[in-house]
């Protein structure tokens, strides 16, 4: 096969968006179409592990990303832009421990990676944290 014929046989990329929400409690991976209106795959770390303490782990995020990638490729999406989100607000401003593992797993699963963007909501003023527990403290 000559070098001129090879790009013509390459398959056409069908893009989607992989939304990775990673907190200190769980990692949720949602793959949508480019408009974001139709959800193609949605997998969380709690779906792939048995113990609750393992939900935020990088291993659970990696398994969830592999599962979401397989579901997306079965629906015809073969390239994704990644949007990573942390809790934001008065919570952590950085994504949890599973975010980087999920990005690596999406890249290894055979999906073409476009842009990687951080979409954590960042306050532009002061956010008052929730008040403590009411009642008598001894």
Curated annotation (Swiss-Prot):
Query: Which GO molecular function entries does the Swiss-Prot or TrEMBL record give?
Result: rRNA binding; structural constituent of ribosome
Q: Which SUPFAM superfamilies match?
A: Translational machinery components
Q: Which GO terms describe its cellular component?
A: ribonucleoprotein complex; ribosome
Name of a matching Pfam family: Ribosomal_S11
Question: Which UniProt keywords are listed?
Answer: Ribonucleoprotein, Ribosomal protein, RNA-binding, rRNA-binding
InterPro entries given for it? Ribosomal_uS11, Ribosomal_uS11_archaeal, Ribosomal_uS11_CS, Ribosomal_uS11_sf
Q: Which PROSITE patterns match?
A: RIBOSOMAL_S11
The reply to whether Cell membrane figures as a keyword in the UniProt entry is no
One GO BP annotation of this record: translation
Gene3D superfamilies given for it? Ribosomal protein S11
Assembly and partners?
Part of the 30S ribosomal subunit.
Return the similarity comment.
Belongs to the universal ribosomal protein uS11 family.
UniProt cross-references to NCBIfam families, sorted A to Z: arch_S11P (TIGR03628), PRK09607.1 (NF007176)
Which function does this protein serve? Located on the platform of the 30S subunit.
Q: Which HAMAP family match?
A: Ribosomal_uS11 (MF_01310)
Q: What is this protein called?
A: Small ribosomal subunit protein uS11
Naturally occurring in which organism (per UniProt): Pyrobaculum arsenaticum (strain DSM 13514 / JCM 11321 / PZ6)
């Amino acid at each position: 096969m000559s070098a001129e014929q090879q790009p013509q046989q390459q398959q056409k990329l069908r893009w989607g968006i992989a939304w990775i929400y990673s907190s200190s409690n769980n990692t949720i991976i949602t793959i949508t179409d480019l408009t974001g209106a139709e959800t193609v795959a949605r997998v969380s770390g709690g779906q792939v592990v048995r113990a609750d303490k393992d939900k935020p782990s990088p291993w659970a995020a990696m398994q969830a990303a592999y599962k979401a990638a397989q579901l997306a490729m079965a629906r015809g999406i073969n390239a994704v832009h990644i949007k990573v989100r942390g809790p934001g607000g008065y919570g952590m401003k950085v994504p949890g421990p599973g975010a980087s593992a999920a990005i690596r797993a999406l890249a290894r699963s055979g999906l073409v990676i476009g842009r990687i963007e951080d979409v954590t909501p960042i306050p532009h003023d002061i956010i008052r944290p929730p008040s403590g527990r009411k009642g008598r403290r001894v």
